Regions:
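Active-site catalytic microenvironments in core metabolic enzymes, especially phosphate/sugar-handling
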Residues: 1-134
Length: 134
């Protein structure tokens, strides 16, 4: 897996393969997917939490990015943009992990980082997990 802080080169993998990997990585998460399962992903952008639809759309407008993996987004904006693009034949897709799921690894890292210099009180990571169930 190569890339920058939030752009990853996933060339050679399909949307379905990436979704399967994320489902195994986050077995308790309710992962939602928009796009053709057979889409050959080139590059993916990752946006934890909820940075807003304009951030997602800005990533999707790039020709080199054809998948965004996000925490959450307004369904009437980002999700509709991807669905419309996919249905119109553009190679675009979105995987929605859920807000909490997308941020939890970063919060665990943050707790470890803070624990290294905060001595006055204990610092611990408490996993919250996905609040939704099927």
């Amino acid at each position: 897996l190569e890339g920058t802080r939030n752009i990853f080169d996933l060339e050679g993998q399909t949307l379905e393969e990436i979704t399967d990997h994320l489902t195994k990585t986050f077995p308790d998460a309710i992962i939602r997917v928009i796009g053709d399962p057979e889409l050959q992903v080139q590059k993916a952008a990752f946006s934890a939490g909820a940075p807003g639809s304009q951030a997602h759309i800005r990533q999707l407008r790039r020709k080199d990015i054809n998948l965004v993996v996000i925490g959450e987004a307004p369904e009437w904006e980002s999700l509709s943009y991807v669905r419309d693009a996919s249905q119109a034949g553009f190679p675009k897709a979105m995987i929605i992990l859920g807000h909490t799921v997308s941020e939890e690894a970063g919060m665990e890292y943050c707790a470890q980082w803070m624990d290294a210099f905060i001595d006055e009180i204990p610092v611990r990571f408490i996993a919250s997990g996905d609040p939704f169930h099927q």
